[in-house]
Amino acid sequence: MGRTLENKQQIVTEIKSLLNDSEMAVVLDYKGLTIKEMSDLRSRLRTTNGICRVTKNSLMRKAIDGDSNWNDLESLLTGTNAFVLIKEDVGGAVKAIQSFQKDTKKSETKGALFEGRLLSDSEIKEIASLPSKEVLMAKIAGALNGVATKIAISINEVPSGLARSLKQHSEKSES
């Protein structure tokens, strides 16, 4: 039995909501994957705040219609597609997808869309090599802390240096 029009509209609304919350979408050809393998992919993505949805291309087409951020996804809507929608840890999610593909050797990436732009395979691999947002923030915080420490030491050194100079000058004057 097919889906009702109301059910299809509900699915399209849900997909639109997921897309609005997502930073990146990766389209995978899931042909040949078992339910167990799809569950494995979903569990790997869960830790990176990614969602894997299998939906009809026609419903995805309706969900992206008129949305300038996701319109370019249209060119990838052929064949059997699983859509990985990534909310936050883009690099971690892409790493999880690549790890899954390496382990199963069944799925392949058709393409990805990030900030309204289609990405090439090499760009997708580059994203996977990036550190997570938390690691980058920690590096920035460390760098800022280092600068603040150096400034504090420098500021503290000016009066200390002046005091030493005055002391040396007074000792010379006394002798």
Swiss-Prot record:
Keywords: Ribonucleoprotein, Ribosomal protein, RNA-binding, rRNA-binding. Pfam families: Ribosomal_L10 (PF00466). It comes from the Bacteria. The keyword RNA-binding applies. GO terms for molecular function: large ribosomal subunit rRNA binding. The keyword Disulfide bond does not apply. One of its GO terms (biological process) is translation. GO terms for cellular component: ribonucleoprotein complex; ribosome. InterPro entries: Ribosomal_uL10, Ribosomal_uL10-like_sf, Ribosomal_uL10_bac, Ribosomal_uL10_bac_type. Coiled coil: none annotated. Belongs to the universal ribosomal protein uL10 family. Part of the ribosomal stalk of the 50S ribosomal subunit. The N-terminus interacts with L11 and the large rRNA to form the base of the stalk. The C-terminus forms an elongated spine to which L12 dimers bind in a sequential fashion forming a multimeric L10(L12)X complex. Forms part of the ribosomal stalk, playing a central role in the interaction of the ribosome with GTP-bound translation factors. This is Large ribosomal subunit protein uL10. It comes from Prochlorococcus marinus (strain MIT 9215). The lineage of its organism: Bacteria, Bacillati, Cyanobacteriota, Cyanophyceae, Synechococcales. The gene is rplJ.
